[in-house]
């Protein structure tokens, strides 16, 4: 599979994905998709070339050819069946929940240093081994590494400490999966996660099933009072409702347990259309406008 992709294409992908990331960081900060579009379009075309090289002499679609790097032996028609089943129920549930009165929200000023200290304590509480990793800051949270060097990142907003806390918990879920692979398998073909789906299940379990549980919310509420003082919420029951509230949002990594799934459903469909040639990169803004998704200018933290 790897040998089917020409060396010059591999080099071009490495070059242009790196360039695209740096441009994306600037475009994201300024809410300027047109700034990012040329690099995005270039990477998209290169990915199509990669898919075509991989799928030679097979019946795979472009999307399915690339999907094998993330979900081995899974094809998009299987994913379609799952998502098509989930979508109506999720949309209906979303409408019901958003129709309810809003819950009390956390309010205040949350210094970055305090958030960072709390994130470190939360990570350690979940079992993250700092002797084999560290937490840094990035525009987009991620986990990287394996074995004895598994690092994670988070990001901070002085107006929204939940973003950093739950990004940290999510990435700790990824990190724990990697840190708990048997040491004898380090640097071998089986010394890594089985698939991205399994990997994401570990991060989402930590973030939602544990991180948004009532028991954990009681502990976290006390920590919030210790680190930040007045947070606009006076009891752990209200705090529990706040960390589980459902509301519209444009950022997948900061979305609630319900909206997150809808982010994935939308991105999956758009991604398939882009890779398989049914949608051009410069049509994305128009398509999103048709479904009333238009992100406002980002506030300065």
What is the meaning of each model-derived region?
Residues 191-278:
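A conserved active-site cap/scaffold subdomain adjacent to cofactor or substrate pockets
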Residues 26-34, 73, 93-105, 182-189, ...:
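Inter-helical turn/loop segments and adjacent helix faces that build the functional surface
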Residues 119, 147, 167, 181-191, ...:
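An N-terminal structural lobe/cap that precedes and organizes the functional/catalytic core
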Residues 13-161:
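Contiguous, non-catalytic segments that form substrate-binding/exosite surfaces or channel walls
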Residues 9-12, 39-42, 82, 111, ...:
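Secondary-structure capping and boundary motifs in well-ordered enzyme cores
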Residues 166-179, 200-204:
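Active-site recognition of the HExxH zinc-binding catalytic motif
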Residues 100-105, 150-158, 182-189, 250-255, ...:
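Glycine- and acidic
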Residues 291-301:
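Single conserved hydrophobic/aromatic residue that forms the stacking wall/gate
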């Amino acid at each position: 599979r790897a040998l089917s992709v020409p060396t010059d294409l591999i080099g071009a992908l490495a070059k242009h994905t790196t360039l695209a990331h740096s441009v994306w960081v600037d475009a994201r900060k300024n809410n300027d998709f047109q700034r990012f579009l040329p690099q995005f379009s270039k990477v998209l075309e290169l990915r199509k070339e990669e898919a075509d090289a991989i799928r030679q002499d097979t019946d795979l679609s472009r999307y399915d050819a690339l999907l094998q790097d993330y979900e081995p032996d899974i094809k998009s028609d299987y994913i379609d069946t799952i998502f098509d089943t989930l979508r109506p129920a999720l949309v209906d549930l979303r409408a019901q929940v958003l129709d309810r009165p809003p819950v009390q929200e956390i309010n205040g000023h949350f210094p970055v240093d305090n958030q960072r200290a709390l994130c470190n304590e939360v990570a350690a509480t979940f079992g993250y081994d700092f002797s084999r990793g560290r937490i840094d800051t990035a525009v987009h949270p991620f986990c990287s590494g394996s074995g004895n060097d598994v690092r994670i990142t988070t990001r901070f907003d002085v107006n929204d400490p939940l973003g950093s806390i739950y990004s940290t918990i999510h990435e700790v879920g990824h990190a724990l999966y990697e840190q708990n692979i048997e040491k004898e398998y380090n640097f071998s073909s089986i010394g890594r996660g089985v698939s991205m789906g399994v990997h994401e299940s570990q991060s989402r379990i930590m973030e939602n099933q544990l991180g948004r549980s009532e028991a954990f919310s009681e502990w976290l509420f006390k920590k919030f009072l210790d680190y930040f003082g007045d947070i606009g919420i006076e009891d752990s029951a209200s705090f529990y409702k706040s960390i589980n509230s459902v509301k519209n949002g444009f950022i997948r990594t900061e979305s609630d347990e319900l909206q997150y799934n809808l982010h994935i459903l939308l991105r999956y469909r758009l991604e398939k259309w882009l890779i398989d040639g049914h949608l051009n990169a410069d049509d994305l803004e128009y398509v999103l406008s048709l479904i009333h998704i238009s992100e406002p200018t980002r506030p300065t933290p």
